[in-house]
């Protein structure tokens, strides 16, 4: 008898659907997750405007939109990525958010105190307390949406595919690009980049989004709703009637305190310390890690 070559068994059919194979690409996953959030956001605003009377539209649409963004993100991660959404886990969420908010307030005060001492920032009077409540829903939406998008979608997916360092570069570039419209200076670009690195490092440390959400919310709320200091070029009318004057490198000019030298020093130090802590904890990913 002549020897014969064993015939290999037939290959198992690829049961993975084509759309799921496409969604495995990092950029496609980022796009799909972003669309899930944007659609939820748009739908929530449309429903609120059609269902609620105009006098309630100040707060409720932003609060509902924040929840809708989180739901859109959760739905994508749970149904498409088919995993437990641990970064939005409820256990300990309030405590983590509060720690982040405390850190955001600390960074804000460290930024503003030297400006107040130098006479760059001045308190000219006391207004009514309505901005403290009116601006809270808007700042909550901003912090939730941006952290879900930049840290939860872009950084997380890029990190899984290309490692932490490349993901840091990509997510920071997107965060800075989103804040470019307006009268932003080079210092403002650097402050925005440093803040993005700090927010991302906070996510890396905990692998949850509550800490950076708290930091982001507190920073924006403190300056806009309390001290009446422009945030990212947006005019602010807060509880305290404050004003900024002096050289632009200190006051930040029209862009606000986020383009000042003190903010750059504070955020650069915060980013360095948080990134070092994340690295020391072994939370830098060097290579591809598949999602569950």
Language-model features, listed with the residues they occupy:
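Membrane-helix interface linkers and caps
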Residues: 2-22, 44-101, 116-127, 278-285
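Transmembrane helix-loop-helix hairpins at the membrane interface
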Residues: 2-19, 29-30, 34, 38-41, ...
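Juxtamembrane interface helix immediately N-terminal to a transmembrane segment
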Residues: 25-26
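Hydrophobic H-region at the start of alpha-helical membrane spans
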Residues: 32-33, 61-66, 102-106, 260-267
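Hydrophobic core positions of alpha-helical segments in small-molecule transporters
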Residues: 91, 100-103, 170-171, 214-215
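Long, hydrophobic/aromatic N-terminal blocks
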Residues: 103, 107-143
């Amino acid at each position: 008898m002549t020897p014969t070559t064993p015939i290999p068994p037939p290959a198992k059919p690829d049961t993975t659907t084509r759309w799921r194979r496409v969604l495995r690409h990092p950029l496609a996953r980022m796009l799909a997750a972003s669309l899930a959030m944007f659609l939820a956001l748009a739908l929530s605003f449309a429903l609120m405007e059609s269902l609620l009377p105009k006098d309630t539209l100040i707060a409720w649409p932003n609060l509902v939109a924040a929840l809708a963004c989180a739901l859109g993100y959760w739905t994508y991660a749970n149904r498409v990525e088919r995993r437990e959404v641990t970064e939005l886990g409820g256990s300990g969420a309030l405590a983590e958010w509060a720690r982040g908010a405390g850190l955001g307030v600390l960074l804000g005060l460290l930024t503003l105190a030297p400006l107040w001492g130098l006479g760059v920032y001045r308190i000219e009077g006391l207004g009514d307390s309505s901005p403290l409540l009116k601006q809270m829903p808007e700042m909550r939406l901003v912090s939730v949406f941006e952290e879900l998008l930049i840290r939860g979608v872009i950084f997380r997916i890029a990190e899984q595919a290309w490692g932490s360092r490349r993901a840091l570069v990509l997510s920071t570039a997107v965060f800075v690009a989103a804040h470019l419209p307006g009268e932003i200076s080079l210092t403002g670009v650097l402050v925005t980049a440093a803040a993005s690195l700090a927010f991302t490092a906070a996510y890396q440390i905990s692998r949850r989004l509550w800490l950076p959400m708290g930091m982001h919310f507190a920073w924006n709320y403190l300056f806009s709703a309390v001290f009446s200091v422009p945030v990212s070029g947006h005019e602010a009318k807060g509880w305290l009637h404050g004003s900024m004057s002096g050289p632009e490198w200190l006051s930040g000019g029209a862009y606000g305190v986020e383009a000042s030298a003190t903010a750059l020093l504070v955020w650069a130090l915060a980013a360095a310390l948080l990134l070092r802590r994340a690295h020391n904890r072994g939370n830098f990913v060097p290579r591809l890690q598949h999602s569950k």
